[in-house]
């Protein structure tokens, strides 16, 4: 059973995702995929910053005060902005009244919770989410 399914099945139990060396390796690996230089990865994964990454993987149900809600809002806005920007850059023919509706639908579909859940699954986030 996947971590996502386990978390759903145990919705009354608060799951605490791991925050040890494997979590740091996940974060470092994501930065490597983004082509960050090793010196920046070292800075961004210091103990203080790892606390912020931990917070970004913690739901309000797991910790009322230290959770990802503010990061979620910032991320949703950023993702939606990227989707719109990319659609117009990649498909300039969408820059018309009919295209606005198409781009709005793309933003809704790709910015949906299920899309982000699939990305989290593909990147192996579930063992680390609390």
Model-identified regions with their sequence ranges:
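RNase III-family endoribonuclease catalytic core
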Residues: 2-130
